[in-house]
UniProtKB/Swiss-Prot annotation:
Residues 113-175 are annotated as: Disordered. This is Uncharacterized protein C16orf90 homolog. It holds the Pfam family DUF4644. It comes from the Eukaryota. InterPro entries: DUF4644 (IPR027978).
């Protein structure tokens, strides 16, 4: 009976018994941290956010929204939202702006440097002559660059996904 009274006396004011470790979802290993009221009920979300708090170290100070709880802006980042990009700031990997393929881009210069060259320094193309055979060779770009080979004008061949056996247009592979 005395143990029951002792346990009930802890219930209203305390979140845990003094002999039990603090809740690992809310800071873990002795760290009692304040949270904003809207984030208290979702422990799995807080568990993920606890592991992502180090993300704040990599964000510049002006990207962290001022006056908001950490779990709010990290939660919005996890949910697929984005933090506002200040004007005039360029992201380090801004490939969506079409930098690859422009003539003045260092990416296209890098790709150009990796193409095979003949004895005169020209890059190989599908219309070049193969000196060993004396016939036009059909050499494409090296496989390691991630570039697709040129498509032939023959019968249309669509590649299929090895997992679902569907073509890019959505039809099933004919067996």
């Amino acid at each position: 009976m005395e143990a029951l009274v002792y346990a009930v006396s802890w219930a209203p004011g305390r979140t845990s018994h003094p002999d039990t470790p603090p809740n690992i979802y809310e800071g873990g290993l002795g760290a009692q941290q304040k949270q904003c009221p809207s984030a208290q009920g979702s422990k799995p979300k807080n568990f993920r956010l606890r592991h992502l708090r180090g993300l704040a170290l990599y964000l510049p100070g002006h990207l962290q929204p001022a006056g908001q709880c950490e779990s709010h802006w990290l939660g919005r980042l996890l949910a697929g939202g984005c933090l506002p990009q200040p004007e005039g700031l360029v992201w380090p990997l801004d490939l969506a702006q079409g930098t690859v393929g422009r003539g003045n881009s260092h990416h296209s210069a890098l790709l150009e440097a990796q193409l095979p060259r003949d004895s005169r320094g020209n890059t190989a193309s599908s219309s070049s002559m193969d000196p060993a055979k004396g016939a036009p060779s059909q050499s494409g770009p090296p496989e390691g660059l991630g570039l697709r080979p040129k498509r032939s004008w023959g019968a249309p061949e669509e590649t299929t996904c090895p997992l679902c056996k569907r073509t890019r247009s959505g039809g099933l592979e004919r067996l």
